[in-house]
C-alpha cells in the first residue's frame, strides 16, 4: 500500500468517525461549560480552577480504557526555569476539602507557585472620568494594592535610558505622583526579553514614586506571567487615548500575594495496540486568567477551553479507535503563570521523556479562517512534514494555511522543547484573535468552524504512527 492510499484511508476513517459521532457538539459543550461565569475564569476564586479540573476528570474517567497517570517516576523535585518563578512540589491543597476527592486525586499532579491575585476593587479615574477596566486600562499583574488620588507627571523620553531612568524615578521629583512613561521607549531599556519589568520596576522606591502608567499605542492585554512578584508601586497600562494633559488619577486596586498557590496538572493515559513504549503526548492548558478585579472575569473560551475540549474529545475518539502508539493526555495548569505547570511536569514526568516521540500542544483553536499558526522544535520537523502532507492531501476539507513561526515561550510546548522533547504547537488565528486576554474571549466570541478539519488532521496523523 503506497503512502497516499494509506493517507486516504486514515482521512476517510477520521471523517466517518467524526460524522457518525457528534464530537463537534461535545467540543462546544465543554467550551461553553468551563467558560461559564461560575468557573470564574478557571482561577482559584471560588475554586473555579478546581471545579474545571473536576469537570475534566468526570468526563475522561467515564471513557473506557483511559487510566490516571499522575504518579511521578521519582520523588518530586522543584523546577527552576530561567526568568520564571520556582515551581515546588505540593500536597493536595484545596482538594482536601473537595467531596469525593479520592475519585480525582489519581489524575492530579500537585505543585505550588507564588501568585499575585486581584479579586477585589479595580477602579481608575482620570480627572474625575472613570476608565473602563480592560478597555481603557489594565493593571499589571505584579501591582500591589493602591487606594487614593495622586497627581500625574509625564517622564520625558530622554530620561528613559539605562543611565538615567531609575535614578530619576528615585530622585524625589515624583514623590506621591504617578509617572506616565512611553511604553515604546521603555522597551528600549536593556533587558532580557523574558524579563522586561522586574530589573527596573522592582528598584523603584515607593517613597519617591506613587505609581507608574505605561502608555502605548494599543492597550497592553492583561497577563499573569509576571504574577510571581510584586513591584513596590502599582503599574497600569493605558493606550494612546490617555489624555496628554491628565492632572490627577484616582485609583482603587486590591491585590493579594499568595506565596504558595496550589496548582494541579491532570494526566491520563491510553495504551496503544502494539504494547510498545513509544508515546505521543497531547497537551492543552486548562487554566486561564481568572479575575482582574471582582467584576472583570476573563472567561477564556478560545484560550484555552478550546484546547481543553479538543483533548477531551480526542481521548473519547481514540478509546474506540485505538492507535498503535500509546497516548498520554495532559491538561496543564499555570500556563498563564508563565508555563509553570509544563516546566514542573518536565522536571517530574510520569513517563520517561525519551519515550515521548512527539508532543502536540493545542492552544487557542476555536477561531475561524484558514490560518493555522504552528511552532515546531528542530527535532520535531520530520513529524511536522508528515502533518503537512496530511493537510495538503486532504480531499475532504480545505487545507489549512500552516504558517510555521519561530518557537518561543508563548505556550507549554516550549517547556518540552527545552527538555529535548520533539514538540509541535497549533493555534488557529482569525477574527476572534482581537479578544485575546480580555473578557470578550467568551462563549459569544469563538468559532467551531475549524473543528472538523483540525480533528481530522490530528487523528489522521496519530493513526499513521
Stretches found by the model and what they are:
Residues 37-47, 112, 154-155, 184-194, ...:
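Second-shell loop/turn segments in exported
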Residues 40-178, 184-189:
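Noncatalytic luminal/extracellular "stalk/propeptide" segments of secretory-pathway proteins
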Residues 323, 332-435:
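Metal-dependent peptidase/peptidase-like ectodomains
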Residues 316, 433-465:
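His/Asp/Glu-rich mid-to-C-terminal helical/loop segments that flank catalytic regions of hydrolases
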Amino acid at each position: 500500500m503506497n503512502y497516499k492510499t494509506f493517507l486516504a484511508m486514515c482521512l476517510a476513517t477520521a471523517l466517518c468517525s467524526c460524522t457518525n459521532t457528534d464530537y463537534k457538539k461535545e467540543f462546544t459543550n465543554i467550551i461553553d461549560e468551563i467558560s461559564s461565569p461560575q468557573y470564574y475564569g478557571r482561577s482559584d476564586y471560588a475554586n473555579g480552577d478546581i471545579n474545571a479540573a473536576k469537570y475534566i476528570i468526570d468526563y475522561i474517567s467515564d471513557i473506557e480504557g483511559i487510566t490516571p497517570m499522575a504518579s511521578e517516576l521519582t520523588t518530586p523535585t522543584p523546577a527552576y526555569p530561567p526568568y520564571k518563578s520556582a515551581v515546588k512540589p505540593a500536597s493536595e491543597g484545596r482538594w482536601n476539602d473537595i467531596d469525593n476527592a479520592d475519585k480525582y486525586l489519581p489524575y492530579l499532579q500537585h505543585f505550588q507557585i507564588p501568585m499575585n491575585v486581584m479579586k477585589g476593587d479595580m477602579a481608575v479615574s482620570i480627572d474625575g472620568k472613570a476608565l473602563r477596566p480592560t478597555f481603557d486600562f489594565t493593571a499589571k499583574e505584579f501591582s500591589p494594592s493602591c487606594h487614593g488620588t495622586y497627581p500625574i507627571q509625564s517622564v520625558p523620553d530622554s530620561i528613559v535610558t539605562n543611565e538615567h531612568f531609575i535614578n530619576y524615578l528615585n530622585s524625589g521629583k515624583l514623590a506621591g505622583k504617578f509617572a506616565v512613561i512611553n511604553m515604546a521607549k521603555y522597551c528600549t531599556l536593556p533587558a532580557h526579553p523574558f524579563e522586561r519589568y522586574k530589573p527596573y520596576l522592582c528598584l523603584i522606591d515607593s517613597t519617591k514614586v506613587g505609581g507608574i502608567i505605561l502608555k502605548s499605542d494599543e492597550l497592553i492585554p492583561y497577563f499573569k506571567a509576571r504574577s510571581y512578584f510584586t513591584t513596590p508601586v502599582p503599574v497600569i497600562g493605558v493606550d494612546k487615548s490617555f489624555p496628554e494633559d491628565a492632572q490627577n488619577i484616582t485609583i482603587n486596586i486590591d491585590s493579594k500575594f499568595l506565596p504558595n498557590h496550589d496548582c494541579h496538572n491532570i494526566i491520563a493515559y491510553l495504551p496503544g495496540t502494539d504494547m510498545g513504549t513509544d508515546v505521543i503526548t497531547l497537551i492543552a492548558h486548562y487554566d486561564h486568567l481568572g479575575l482582574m478585579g471582582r467584576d472583570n472575569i476573563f472567561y477564556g473560551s478560545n484560550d484555552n477551553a478550546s484546547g481543553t475540549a479538543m483533548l477531551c474529545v480526542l481521548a473519547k475518539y481514540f478509546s474506540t479507535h485505538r492507535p498503535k502508539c500509546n497516548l498520554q493526555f495532559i491538561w496543564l495548569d499555570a500556563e498563564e503563570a508563565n508555563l509553570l505547570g509544563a516546566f514542573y511536569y518536565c522536571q517530574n514526568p510520569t513517563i520517561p521523556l525519551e519515550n515521548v516521540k512527539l508532543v502536540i500542544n493545542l492552544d487557542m483553536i476555536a477561531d475561524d479562517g484558514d490560518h493555522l499558526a504552528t511552532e515546531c522544535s528542530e527535532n520535531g520537523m520530520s513529524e511536522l512534514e508528515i502533518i503537512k502532507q496530511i493537510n495538503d492531501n486532504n480531499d475532504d476539507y480545505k487545507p489549512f494555511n500552516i504558517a510555521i513561526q519561530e518557537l518561543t515561550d508563548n505556550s507549554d510546548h516550549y517547556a518540552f522543547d527545552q527538555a529535548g522533547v520533539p514538540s509541535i504547537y497549533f493555534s488557529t488565528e482569525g477574527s476572534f484573535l482581537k479578544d485575546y486576554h480580555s473578557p470578550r474571549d467568551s462563549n459569544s466570541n469563538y468559532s467551531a468552524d475549524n473543528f472538523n478539519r483540525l480533528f481530522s488532521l490530528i487523528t489522521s496523523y496519530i493513526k499513521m504512527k
